[in-house]
Amino acid sequence: MSKDIIQGVWLSGKVHIITNQVVKEQIKPIAAGQTVVADCSHLLVFAAWDTYTAERINKVYDHLTEVRGFTNAGLDNYRQRLLNGYPPRDAEVNFAHAARQAYIAFSMAIVAAAFEGVDATPMEGFDPAALDELLGLREN
């Protein structure tokens, strides 16, 4: 992965911050030719996971405890509840949930950008399969 693509993770997916101009130009036709994709300084792609797995849940919580310095004891009950509830559910139910969570994360980013005085253009119109392939999202 390029150093020009930074990833952040939350329980339901990842945000990819793309600054590489070549990659942004490759995304433009995938985004119905919307020029703002190539013209922006930073393109944020909020990618929802297709389903929840024990591995993904554990990875997020292990990262959370490491970065924030939490003890596992404080999160173990919640983690266990997620592990017992999410992975066994139907993949379509999980994807719909993850997509809604992506919109929540996206909304927070837009609010933060506005607060900081950063111009932001919320948009849809991407070809999901083509974007998945270009950014290697299925492997992540």
Task: State each model region's role.
Residues 1-140:
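Acidic, surface-exposed loops and disordered segments
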